[in-house]
Amino acid sequence: MNPANFQPPNPPFHWAPMLPPDPPRCGMFWNTKNITDQLKQLQDTLNLAKSMEKELEALKMIKDAKGSVENAVQDSGVEYLEARKMDLGQQEMLSVDAANSLMSTLRAQLEPFRFVVDENSPWEEKSAAVRLTCKMKKSIRNKLWKKRKRRCAAEMRAKEPERFEQADREADEWREKEMAKDMANRKVDEMKAIEKIKAKRERKRLEPELELALIVEEMQELRSLRIEKLKKQGHFLPEEDDKFFESVRAAVEQEENQAQSLINTETEEHVIASEENTTLTTSNKTNNDTDKDSNTNAASCERTMKAPDNGCDNISNLPVEVYHYYYGSNIDMGRLIEIRREWDAYLSAGGSRIPGHWVQPSPPANEIWASCLVNTPKRDLS
């Protein structure tokens, strides 16, 4: 809006409008209440300026229509002029004066706020403006926080019946569980009481039997002591006839076994003597030294077998297989070679007792496991 375009050719003299005094640039001017009042006045002035702009635009439209009210469009502005019986020039003059006065008032109201954007203004003004801005933002935040708080409180109040219902349901469930537990505990207590009563009755019923059992045990102990005493004195008890007959039967069987073993040893001696004769006739002349050694060994063995004082009487009690294996190799060279060949089937080529397909184990992990190993030297068994 530029009121200079609406200036009349000869404007009349008019007094300058009354302007508010210039408030102090710092201090009380930048408090919240004063700034709020100033902003309200500024908002009212801006609203008046917008209305004045619309009025001037309407007057310009009427003036462009050659200033004739009759030729102008019949609108609210023309009707107003006809009702007031005012000329278009006079109304234009009054409107321009009001617009100029309004612009002066607007400049006066905006003048205190010029220090905020002016770079040459002192820092006190800027700091006061910044503090006021912070206060206003804080006030806005507080309003928003209070609004959120009220909304949360309303939501909590709306949810309060639901919480009460939930608490009631939980209390009912807990009460039912506790009642079920109490009933189960009462049943368990009743069962325990019944079991105690049954145990007491059973104990009362078994007490005489237990007493009789203890008496029987004591009588048996006393009887065993008397039997031992009689045995020491040389008495024979009739209830031990089976044991006596069994001991007699075992002694007879032992004598029969000893007689049979003597017969077996005699037959073995005859068999060994016949084998010696056959091996002596079939041996080569190149093995004379070996035959002599075997004959000497056989003679020494025969002497030891015939000598009763050297403790060789147990040889006659050995079975045929044992005698043929252990003592036949000392007498018969053929039997010795046969035994050696039987053992060769279980020995490896290197003379070790470990089979050839045996996997060599890994070394021990530490000294403790190594101490468990037994280092036995290899023996030549061939």
Swiss-Prot record:
The keyword Protease does not apply. Residues 31-63 form a coiled coil. GO terms for biological process: mRNA processing; RNA splicing. Keywords: Coiled coil, mRNA processing, mRNA splicing, Nucleus, Ribonucleoprotein, Spliceosome. Residues 277-287 have a biased composition (Low complexity). The keyword Ion transport does not apply. Pfam families: PDCD7. It is found in: Nucleus. Residues 274-297 are annotated as: Disordered. GO terms for cellular component: spliceosomal complex. InterPro entries: Apoptosis_promoter, PDCD7. Component of the U11/U12 snRNPs that are part of the U12-type spliceosome. PANTHER family: PROGRAMMED CELL DEATH PROTEIN 7. This is U11/U12 small nuclear ribonucleoprotein 59 kDa protein.
